[in-house]
């Protein structure tokens, strides 16, 4: 919503907003944009407005929501409002269970490197691009398109409102158990999205993702741009290269590491290539791309210990992160600290898949506040303090600590770093 506020401000609207709390860097960013913010939800803080944009975190019973409904004031969801802003733009939307933020920022970085004044709205914070949103003056607009619901009054996925011209589908898996009952529920929302891609639009996807293949077999009416063996765009993970129309392009020497990032890079290069950017120019732009905060981000390094922070909160993402670290830091011992943070993880929906994903760690410690792992592994606790104490006792025996959570990770890595420095 903060990014949307910036885009609406840049569009010429007067903007103010309320939220439960505001934190840096977004609070500082909104202040710099001269956007008034109010902590908490109070009718007294609500100005007379032409339109009220309601975020999907709010529901019936909220004082401001009830005031809007009781007085028949005009309102829309955030995605619907953004969709109106995007009506005249050429939208590149990045969707899928994993890799949306990284891939979207890669596309932004490529286009900006070509001098294109794009618009964008991406979750997370890039290490190289200022801010997570910009209106821009060019026709092109890049957006991270997630499948979460739009608002309490519109349970369609957000991405339905964005009307993409180019859609990237990185992968599809079951997640967001608080919103979706099963994989079929998620597939249904993606099918609705596929149905609104124009006939002259493009869908970029990976042939090796069965769930995406199953989705597209239900029907597609746009140009399909598969990445896979014997296709126009191919990926060779073992040799770290992209092959397009018989030409090979090396991805060696990139700042980012891990097979999942090679796939993200390939998706970004493919999406920009079909929008007019030469592959060699995209590779040149991405070679020094430093990625996104909280994606395999090194928070501490000395001669004996490395601490890495990652946003992984799904078995597949956990395995991606572990595999990437093992490949980058060969023959190093790795201890993992995994917090069950997402609604799906907290409820234990993934079952034993979380253990399988973490099997290649030398040791794993689990922060499990609902105790769904109790009795199933030795190093799990509902106590954050107990987990941190355990890590402090063990960290000298390992080369790398890999922290994986979608919650505030600073509260986890900061005390460990202080412990190391204080020894």
What are these regions, as identified by a protein language model?
Residues 20-23, 41-43, 56-60, 80, ...:
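Short, polar loop motifs at secondary-structure junctions
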Residues 7-13, 31, 44-47, 56, ...:
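Phosphate-binding loop of NTP-binding sites
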Residues 239-246:
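Short polybasic amphipathic segments
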Residues 38-41, 76-83, 121-124, 219-237, ...:
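Beta-strand->loop->alpha-helix junctions that form or flank phosphate-binding loops
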Residues 251-258, 305-309:
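Short pre-catalytic strand/loop immediately N-terminal to key active-site residues, enriched for Gly-Thr
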Residues 1-22, 31-37, 48, 52, ...:
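ATP-dependent carboxylate-amine ligase
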Residues 160-174, 213, 256-291:
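A conserved, hydrophobic alpha-helical segment in the catalytic core
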């Amino acid at each position: 919503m903060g990014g949307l506020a910036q885009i609406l401000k840049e569009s010429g609207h007067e903007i103010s907003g309320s939220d439960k709390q505001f934190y840096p860097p977004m609070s500082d960013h909104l202040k710099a944009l001269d956007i008034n913010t109010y902590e908490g939800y109070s009718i007294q803080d609500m100005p007379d407005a032409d339109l009220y944009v309601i975020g999907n975190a709010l529901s019936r019973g909220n004082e401001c929501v009830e005031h809007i409904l009781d007085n028949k004031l005009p309102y829309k969801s955030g995605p619907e409002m953004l969709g109106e802003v995007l009506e005249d733009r050429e939208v590149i939307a990045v969707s899928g269970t994993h890799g949306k933020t990284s891939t979207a920022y890669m596309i932004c970085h490529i286009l900006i490197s070509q001098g294109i004044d794009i618009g964008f709205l991406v979750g997370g914070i890039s290490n190289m691009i200022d801010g997570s949103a910009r209106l821009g003056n060019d026709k092109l607009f890049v957006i991270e398109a997630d499948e979460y619901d739009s608002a309490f009054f519109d349970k369609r996925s957000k991405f339905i409102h964005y009307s993409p011209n180019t859609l990237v589908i990185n992968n599809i898996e079951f997640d967001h158990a608080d919103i979706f009952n099963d994989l079929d529920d998620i597939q249904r929302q993606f099918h609705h999205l596929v149905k609104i891609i124009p006939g002259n639009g493009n869908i970029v996807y990976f042939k090796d993702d069965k769930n995406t293949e199953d989705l597209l077999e239900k029907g597609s009416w746009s140009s399909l741009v598969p990445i896979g063996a014997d296709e126009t765009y191919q990926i060779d993970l073992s040799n770290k290269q992209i092959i397009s129309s018989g030409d090979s392009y090396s991805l060696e020497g990139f700042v980012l590491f891990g097979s999942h990032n090679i796939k993200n890079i390939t998706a970004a290069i493919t999406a920009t290539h079909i929008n007019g950017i030469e592959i060699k120019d995209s590779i040149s732009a991405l070679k020094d791309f430093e990625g996104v905060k909280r994606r395999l981000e090194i928070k501490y390094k000395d001669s004996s210990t490395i601490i890495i922070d990652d946003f992984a909160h799904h078995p597949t993402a956990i395995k991606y992160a572990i595999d990437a670290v093992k490949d980058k830091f060969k023959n190093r011992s790795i201890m993992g600290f995994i917090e069950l943070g997402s609604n799906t993880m907290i409820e234990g929906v993934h079952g034993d898949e979380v253990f399988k994903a973490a099997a290649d760690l030398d040791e794993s410690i689990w922060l499990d506040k609902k105790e769904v792992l109790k009795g199933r592994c030795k190093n799990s606790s509902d106590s954050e303090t107990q987990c941190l104490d355990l890590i402090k006792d063990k960290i000298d025996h390992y080369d790398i600590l890999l922290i994986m959570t979608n919650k505030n990770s600073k509260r986890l890595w900061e005390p460990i770093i202080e412990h190391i420095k204080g020894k």
